[in-house]
C-alpha cells in the first residue's frame, strides 16, 4: 500500500538533507506518494507568510508530513513555522530519541533515552507583550492588586500557562510510549521548588498519572539537577517528560550526548496528525555545498515509517545508518572531525545517503 506524505524541504540545508532522506526511504521499497510543499523564508515574497494556507491544507489531508529545517528569525520577524504547525495541528508531543551511534565522536557511550516534551503551552504558547504595551501596565496593576510585588514598568512580559488537561495528556503519552516500547522508567522534570503554581501543577498531575502505571518506575527531578545528572550519569534516565521550555533545552543537551543535533531525529505527534523532522537548524552558512549531515533527517524518516506501520523498513534504515557510521569510510565532515580530528576523507550529503542505501539489508 502506498502512503501519502507531505514533504516540506525547508530552508538552508533543508532541500539537500530531505533529498538524501527521500532517496533512502525509496530504496527500502516502501511506496510513498510525496506531496512536496514549500514553506519558510523562501515563500515570504510570494505569499506574504512563511506558512501558506495550502501547506496546512495538504498536511491536514495526508495527516503525515516530514520536513527539513525552517529558518526562524531571532528577536524580530515572523514567528516560528515549527511552532505554528504544532499549534495548528495540536501536535502536543515532541518525541526525540537520543541513542548513541558507532563513531558519533561523543565522549559518552551507550546512551539510550527518550525526551517527551509538551509542545503546545508553557512559555512557548506565544502569549507575549512588548515593553510599553498597554497590557503590560494592566498586568502590573493586576499583580499589585493580588498583593504580590509587581515588576518594572519597562518590562516585556511572557505568560506561562500550564494546564491540568495538557499536563495529563503529555504525561500519559510518556507512560504509554514507555509501555509500548519496553521502557522501564519515566522521569518528570520540573522546577516546582520555585514555580510552585505552574510547575507544581505539572508535578502533581504527573504523580497522579504515574499511579495508574504501576509497571513503570516513576521519579521526578528538578530541571537543573536533571541537566547535571544527564552529563554525569545518562544511564540513570530512560524516558523524560517535560514542559515545553525545559524539553526544548534538555533535548538539545541530550543530542550533545550522542554526537550533536546532526544525529538527533524528532517527531511531533497529535491525536490525528504527525510531523517528523530533524531537530537542528537550517544552517544557511553551509547551504548548497553538499556537506550537511543528513543522519537526523534520515532517522526521522525511520520514525515516520514506524508511525506508518512500516516497522521493518524503519529498522533497516536504522541498521544501515549505524553500519555506515560504524564503518566510518563514507561519513560527512562533522562526523569525520569527531572521529579523527580532521575533515580529510569526508564525503558529501548525497554520498553519505549512497552509503546508507548500500548498507540497507
Model-derived features: positions:
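Glycine-rich phosphate/diphosphate-binding loop of Rossmann-like nucleotide-binding domains
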Residues: 6-27, 137-221
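Buried hydrophobic packing segments
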Residues: 21, 206, 297-305, 356
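Flexible, glycine/charged-enriched surface loops at secondary-structure junctions
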Residues: 32-36, 181-190, 213-221, 310-318, ...
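Glycine-rich phosphate/nucleotide-binding loop
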Residues: 41-44, 229-330
